[in-house]
């Protein structure tokens, strides 16, 4: 499938999904105005949402710009020392000092 057609499927899928959201909001507003209980979204809105999901997924899958997910391509650029270096996971305010005080009493 050509790239342009895949983009068209994506745009159509997103626009149908936005219309689905708008329809659901309008339905909810209508139920509030008429004091009816909310029992769920109507069937046509659910079908419209599923159709938009399939159109958008089809467009994304056929866009031909998917990047392969391989660890070797990302890890080839790093040195061996940087694999396990994660400073964001270093915690200095932990319960170790309190446990040390309790255990040494």
Curated annotation (Swiss-Prot):
Tell me what organism the protein belongs to: Dictyostelium discoideum
CC annotations in GO: early endosome; EMC complex; endoplasmic reticulum membrane; Golgi apparatus; plasma membrane
Relate the assembly described in the record.
Component of the ER membrane protein complex (EMC).
Name the gene behind this protein.
mmgt
Q: What is this protein called?
A: ER membrane protein complex subunit 5 homolog
Q: Kindly give the membrane topology term recorded for this protein.
A: Multi-pass membrane protein
Q: Where are the transmembrane segments?
A: 4-22, 44-63
The family database entries (Pfam families) matched by this protein are listed as: MMgT
Q: Which residues lie on this side of the membrane: Lumenal?
A: 23-43
Q: Any idea which UniProt keywords this protein has? A: Endoplasmic reticulum, Magnesium, Membrane, Transmembrane, Transmembrane helix, Transport
Q: What does this protein do?
A: Part of the endoplasmic reticulum membrane protein complex (EMC) that enables the energy-independent insertion into endoplasmic reticulum membranes of newly synthesized membrane proteins. Preferentially accommodates proteins with transmembrane domains that are weakly hydrophobic or contain destabilizing features such as charged and aromatic residues. Involved in the cotranslational insertion of multi-pass membrane proteins in which stop-transfer membrane-anchor sequences become ER membrane spanning helices.
Q: Which PANTHER family match?
A: ER MEMBRANE PROTEIN COMPLEX SUBUNIT 5 (PTHR21181:SF7), PTHR21181
Q: Where in the cell is it found?
A: Endoplasmic reticulum membrane
Write out the GO biological process terms.
Answer: magnesium ion transport; protein insertion into ER membrane by stop-transfer membrane-anchor sequence
